[in-house]
């Protein structure tokens, strides 16, 4: 393992002070510590300067051009050490390079190589070459620790390893990394990293890091869906959930969501299952990952067999917890490659066929993470995908749904946005609710950053083409700017004075 580039003495002092003072600042002002900024994966960022009027002045900051090694699929993270005048951007690439970058100057504060990534030829199928870090890492601001999973080639064999790195200098913390196959073997399970891939964003909840695993593009080998919980204090004592049948991948880029009490995740298609065995489903799990298995703890569409046969699974998109105004029941939204939206009772997911509402909302399979915002007494959910009910004048690869309180709740298309590509959206508001703006990257499409008014879909901003965007790429909002990760580099967008 290569040593980290040595951070400056000034940076080491700032890092030490941040651990002492971190509790003094609200977390939202300091960090984008996880995928979509929140454990619930809402993707809603408070940015007081980002009004509808000023969004039209956004521009690419050409003076900000940090570089690193490797392709980038994981979302960047942002951490503001207490007492610091600038934040730190964290990127983790498919070359197994993790870098900390000053958010103002673009200077590299430290860089760490976790070891050689695995070439595609190592695996019986797949589409990422080489394969290193794919799932978005997670930050624990209280301890100044970054947790991530990496595929490392060691002794000619691939290994899934979970790392804990110091945010101060990138050093691997004592007791880490954890070899996933070894930890699961000690718990009585067989895990083969040659057919088990890690795409889902990591989640940190109550001192445990939760990691979803699935298969490779091509569905080769005897893989299963897994959720592995790694306690940060005892990383060799893992918690485990596994799909019963072959398949059932936990692979959505948004990973596992949480409302602070339970974990929510979706699974992909299974193979050869004569009775339902954990695929095509949404699960609610306690942090122990031990569930009764009753119908209140899972949902699967009634046509799960047909979805299995057609590879139209629910596993491509993370579930989204939401609540409507007026004290209505807490809900969970699931979106599928079957082009449907499913509204579920979060306290009773309903078992097979037990959704509150099921409606076709997209003209094509839905594949990326949704985002959530509130407006006019309803919840709005935005996803990348061509809507089923879009007006032709606004036809494009962005759809916003409106969820209306009621018994059952109402579900309708609010508006659609004209753009092309497969990024995942986020939302900025000035105070948590006002002047919402939907932002999305046209990754592997027009490759531009787009901004739309959240109330009616009016286009506010279309940026220049960007190089190196990978599908499902997700931007973040922090430090009065928007940051975009791409192969080997970061972009920043700023408002004009």
In which residue ranges do the predicted regions lie?
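Compositionally biased, intrinsically disordered low-complexity segments
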Residues: 7, 17, 183, 435-437
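Mobile, glycine-rich extracellular loop/lid and propeptide segments
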Residues: 30-290, 295-325, 329-351, 367-375, ...
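N-terminal secretory signal peptides that target proteins for export/translocation
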Residues: 1-10
């Amino acid at each position: 393992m290569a040593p980290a580039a040595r951070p400056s003495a000034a940076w080491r002092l700032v890092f030490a002070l941040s651990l002492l003072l971190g509790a003094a600042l609200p977390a939202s002002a300091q960090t984008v510590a996880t995928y979509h900024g929140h454990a619930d994966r809402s993707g809603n960022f408070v940015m007081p300067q980002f009004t509808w009027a000023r969004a039209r002045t956004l521009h690419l900051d050409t003076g900000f051009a940090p570089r690193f090694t490797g392709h980038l699929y994981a979302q960047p993270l942002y951490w503001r050490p207490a007492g610091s005048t600038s934040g730190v951007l964290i990127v983790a690439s498919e070359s197994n390079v993790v870098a900390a970058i000053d958010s103002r100057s673009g200077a590299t504060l430290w860089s760490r190589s976790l070891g050689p990534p695995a070439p595609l030829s190592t695996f019986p199928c797949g589409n990422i070459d080489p394969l290193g870090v794919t799932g978005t890492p997670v930050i624990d601001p209280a301890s100044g620790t970054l947790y991530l999973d990496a595929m490392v080639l060691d002794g000619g064999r691939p290994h899934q390893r979970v790392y804990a790195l110091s945010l101060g200098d990138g050093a691997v913390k004592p007791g880490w990394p954890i070899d996933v196959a070894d930890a699961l073997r000690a718990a009585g399970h067989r895990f083969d990293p040659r057919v088990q891939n890690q795409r889902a964003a990591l989640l940190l909840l109550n001192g445990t890091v939760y990691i979803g695993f699935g298969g490779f593009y091509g569905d080769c080998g005897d893989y299963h869906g897994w959720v592995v919980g790694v306690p940060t204090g005892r990383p060799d004592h893992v918690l485990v959930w596994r799909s019963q049948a072959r398949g059932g991948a936990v692979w959505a880029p948004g990973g596992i969501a949480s409302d602070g009490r339970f974990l929510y995740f979706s699974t992909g298609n299974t193979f050869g299952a004569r009775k339902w065995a954990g695929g095509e489903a949404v699960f609610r799990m306690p942090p122990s990952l031990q569930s009764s298995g009753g119908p209140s703890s899972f949902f699967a569409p009634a046509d799960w067999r047909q979805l299995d046969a057609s590879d139209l699974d629910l596993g491509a998109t993370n579930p989204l917890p939401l609540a409507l105004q007026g004290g209505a029941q807490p809900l969970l939204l699931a979106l599928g490659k079957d082009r449907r939206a499913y509204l579920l009772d979060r306290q009773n997911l309903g078992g097979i066929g037990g959704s509150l509402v099921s409606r076709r909302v997209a003209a094509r399979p839905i594949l990326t993470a949704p985002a959530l915002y509130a407006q006019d007494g309803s919840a709005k959910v935005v996803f990348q995908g061509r809507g089923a009910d879009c007006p032709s004048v606004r036809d494009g690869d962005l759809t916003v749904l409106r969820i209306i309180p009621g018994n059952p709740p109402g579900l309708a298309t609010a508006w659609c946005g004209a753009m092309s590509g497969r990024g995942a959206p986020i939302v900025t508001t000035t105070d948590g609710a006002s002047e919402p703006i939907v932002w999305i990257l046209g990754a592997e499409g027009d490759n531009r950053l787009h901004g739309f008014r959240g109330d009616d879909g009016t286009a506010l901003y279309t940026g220049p083409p960007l190089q190196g965007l990978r599908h499902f790429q997700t931007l973040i909002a922090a430090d009065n700017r928007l940051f975009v990760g791409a192969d080997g580099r970061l972009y920043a967008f700023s408002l004009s004075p």
